[in-house]
Design a protein with these regions (language model features):
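Helix-to-loop junctions at the C-terminal end of transmembrane segments
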Residues: 57-69, 154, 249-261
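Residue-level signature of mid-helix packing/kink "hotspots" within the transmembrane helices
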Residues: 51-59, 143-144, 243-251
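Paired small-residue
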Residues: 95-103, 276
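C-terminal membrane-cytosol helix-exit motif in multi-pass small-molecule transporters
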Residues: 150-151, 165-185
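Helix-loop boundary and gating motifs at the non-cytosolic
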Residues: 2-51, 203-207, 214-224, 228, ...
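Helix-breaking motifs and short loop linkers at transmembrane-helix boundaries and internal kinks
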Residues: 69, 90-92, 261, 282
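Cytoplasmic helix-loop-helix junction between adjacent transmembrane helices
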Residues: 102-137
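Structural signature of the two symmetry-related core transmembrane helices
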Residues: 72-87, 165, 264-279
Length: 282
């Protein structure tokens, strides 16, 4: 496990910077849309653009990785994502923001694919759960601490958009200059949803349900906070606590998944998540 982390520190650092940026931009755009006078429905549609791009990118980007490799794909997508967030501050319109969110979604699903396939390739089955849990800890911690950047600048200026762009650009540096073994993507096989469901029904259903819940909170969590009287600083703390809780829990879940039946762990974690969600609204 130590050797794995030693060989992938550049990747994990890049992921951390990338997720700082993504965590900040998700809440920032929701807040800024509200400040610009968009209704909750309109803001929700704008933010949905990210997930539409995410879905399309999941079908298109793997072929790009196969053709040009992990490092070049990561560099290209990070550069496009960095540009797209700056355009948000240059041109404020419903359609313009939707398109930029769509492009950002395509870029980030590609960045996730590069990072996760890289980690997966470098870990054996005995330690895969722990390796992926470390990846998720870095990812979610980055997203969580990204929320706190809302404290440092005026939300009605371009400063926070620039900070997001800078963080994305920084994520490139260690990956481009540190030589590391790259996965062989030449044997990658595309799986249909039907094939995935046949291989792991519980995994597919859990992924869909988790995506629905996760996307809803990420998409309108900041707007919900503002509409219910929270200040922008309180919204950042609200979103931070949601994400950091997941980060803290990741390694334990990954460790248990390496020791016990992963289906059992999924059921237990899903039950606990549902229970605490119900308690939160009582």
């Amino acid at each position: 496990m130590y050797n794995l982390l030693k060989g992938t520190w550049a990747l994990f650092f890049g992921v951390g910077m990338m997720m700082l940026a993504n965590g900040l931009q998700g809440s920032l755009i929701g807040i800024r849309a509200s400040l610009e006078g968009y209704s909750a429905s309109a803001a929700g549609i704008i933010l949905t653009g990210y997930y539409a791009g995410f879905l399309l990118g999941a079908l298109y980007i793997p072929q790009r990785i196969k053709n040009v490799g992990h490092v070049r794909t990561f560099a290209a997508l990070a550069s496009i994502a960095s540009i797209s967030i700056l355009i948000h501050s240059l041109h404020i319109s419903f359609l313009g923001w939707f398109i930029m969110r769509f492009i950002s979604g395509m870029c980030f699903v590609g960045l996730y694919t590069v990072a996760e396939s890289w980690v997966n390739d470098l870990s054996d089955n005995e330690h895969r759960g722990q390796a992926l849990s470390v990846y998720m800890i870095v990812s979610m911690a980055g997203s969580a601490f990204g929320q706190l950047f809302l404290y440092i600048a005026d939300h009605e200026t371009a400063t926070l958009f620039m900070i997001v762009s800078v963080l994305i650009s920084i994520s490139l540096v260690p990956i481009l200059i540190v030589v590391s073994k790259q996965p062989d993507f030449s044997v990658a096989k595309f799986f249909t949803v039907k094939e995935l469901y046949k291989a792991s029904p519980l995994g597919v259903v859990t992924s869909i349900m988790t995506g629905l819940a996760h996307g809803t909170l990420w998409g309108i969590g900041s707007i919900y906070g503002l509409k219910n009287g929270l200040s922008i600083e309180q919204v950042s703390i609200f979103m931070f606590t949601f994400v950091i809780g997941g980060a803290i829990n990741q390694y334990l879940v990954g460790y248990l998944s390496d020791k016990y039946d992963r289906r059992t762990i999924i059921v237990i974690v899903a039950f606990l998540a549902s229970l605490f969600s119900v308690l939160a609204v009582l």
